[in-house]
Amino acid sequence: MTRSTNLSHTSALILGTIGAGYRYGFDIMAATGLPSGTVYPALRRLERDGLIKSEWEQDKDAHAAQRPARKNYTLSRSGRTTLDGAIERYPLLRQLVLAARD
């Protein structure tokens, strides 16, 4: 059984959102409408499973913007493959991802 078969709707939606260019937790919450108590644990699981990567923003950039440093999320190669499989499995996800890319 492939990872995309085991991917929850929430995880698929978050992967699709990251794949569409939303990079930070707050942006992902805003784009999906999911609460932080759903998004952040899912991000940790996706990173643990190797589907996404994260990197902290440079302190100087955050300081210049007068806010705390943010964690930037990107799809891994495995995450891209899994997202493509999820898009085939969840037709609505395809519509959401395509709409977000426009």
Q: Which residues does each PLM region occupy?
A:
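Short, charged/polar surface micro-motifs in flexible loops or helix N-caps
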Residues: 20-24, 48-49, 79-81
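Basic amphipathic alpha-helical segments that dock to polyanions
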Residues: 39-51
